[in-house]
């Protein structure tokens, strides 16, 4: 097995000049940014809610953009553990321009005396939360995988080989959550949150929205798929990559992923990249086809329940992490495996 080390230290982050009137109260609230598309919540946002619950505070949801009033009502009834849902209805926020969202969040955090703001460590979260932290003059705590207490969190470093415990004395905690490290918050329809309209300062956008090209795909989303088939450099080119992996993925109902080398070589789209600089995933089954197992790639798959590797090099590092390994020619093994499924 891959040997890892765990190192813990406490870091007191610089206190902010921003003050909130909380005195010595023990009660506190955690505002969670809830991303949505097509009227549905992002699964990653439900994981952020679960992480927020573990602080011990009251968890509020924050919905912004087009149809946010309607979505908030739906969220309030469906997500079990929210106490309040705050919404800001404004179609101009539909495209999640970070400066706008951060400004709206800033005003609502101040109004509601929020002590923690959580979001998924997603494209939206990575754009909005650093800006929000700068506005409050506090340190952001990024990509957490554990909650120790209301002011202490665990996050990975060194490509996931070291887990660092970080403690902050900042009056407001700005936190992004690694979705694969937390289960989704229950959404069984037993929610009883109140819904309130938030403040809309209508900030001017510093960027202009031009266009969006959404690639429609019948496959499960790579970030949340239960099964993933991924390929690496030995697949040679884009045509071979698709010819070998697609039939297997179809049989398994799996998402398709790729290593950074495969993406850089043009075998697969950048959206399929898995690893430290790509997507962090935690499927029930991960099949690595022709992947050696660079440490940066392993950082993206280490939370998978079962890792199966196919590689002709018996000394490939991937076999130190894999639960199941097949040493052999992938061009023979994968078609045979696909045929037998």
Curated annotation (Swiss-Prot):
Q: Detail which positions bind FAD.
A: 285-313
Main localization (coarse): mitochondrion
Locations listed in the record: Mitochondrion matrix
Q: What does this protein do?
A: The electron transfer flavoprotein serves as a specific electron acceptor for several dehydrogenases, including five acyl-CoA dehydrogenases, glutaryl-CoA and sarcosine dehydrogenase. It transfers the electrons to the main mitochondrial respiratory chain via ETF-ubiquinone oxidoreductase (ETF dehydrogenase).
Q: Identify its protein family.
A: Belongs to the ETF alpha-subunit/FixB family.
Subunit field text: Heterodimer of an alpha and a beta subunit.
Q: What is this protein called?
A: Probable electron transfer flavoprotein subunit alpha, mitochondrial
Source species of the chain = Schizosaccharomyces pombe (strain 972 / ATCC 24843)
């Amino acid at each position: 097995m891959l040997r890892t080390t765990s190192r813990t230290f406490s870091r007191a982050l610089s206190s902010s000049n921003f003050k909130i009137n909380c005195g010595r109260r023990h009660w506190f609230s955690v505002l969670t940014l809830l991303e949505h598309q097509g009227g549905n919540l992002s699964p990653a946002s439900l994981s952020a809610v679960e992480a927020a619950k573990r602080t011990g505070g009251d968890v509020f949801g924050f919905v912004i953009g087009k149809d946010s009033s309607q979505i908030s009502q739906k969220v309030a009834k469906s997500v079990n553990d929210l106490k309040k849902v705050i919404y800001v209805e404004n179609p101009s926020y539909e495209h999640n321009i970070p400066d706008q969202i951060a400004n709206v969040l800033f005003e609502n955090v101040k109004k509601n005396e929020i002590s923690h703001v959580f979001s998924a460590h997603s494209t939206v979260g990575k754009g909005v939360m650093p800006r929000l932290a700068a506005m409050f003059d506090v340190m952001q705590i990024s990509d957490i995988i554990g909650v120790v207490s209301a002011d202490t969190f665990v996050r990975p470093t060194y490509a996931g080989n070291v887990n660092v415990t970080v403690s902050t004395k900042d009056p407001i905690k700005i936190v992004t959550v690694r979705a694969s490290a937390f289960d989704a918050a229950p959404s069984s329809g037993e929610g009883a949150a109140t819904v309130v309209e938030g403040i809309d300062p209508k900030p001017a956008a510093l960027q202009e929205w031009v266009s969006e090209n959404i690639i429609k795909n019948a496959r499960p989303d790579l970030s949340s798929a239960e099964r993933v088939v991924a390929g690496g450099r030995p697949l040679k080119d884009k045509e071979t990559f698709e010819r070998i992996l697609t039939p297997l993925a179809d049989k398994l109902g799996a998402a398709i992923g790729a290593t950074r080398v495969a993406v850089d070589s043009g075998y697969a789209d950048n959206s399929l990249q898995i690893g430290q600089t790509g997507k962090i995933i935690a499927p029930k089954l991960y099949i690595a086809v022709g992947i050696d197992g660079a440490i940066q790639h392993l950082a993206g798959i280490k939370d998978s329940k079962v890792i199966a590797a196919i590689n002709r090099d018996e000394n490939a590092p991937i076999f130190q992490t894999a639960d199941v390994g097949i040493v052999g020619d992938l061009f023979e093994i994968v078609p045979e495996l696909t045929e037998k499924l």
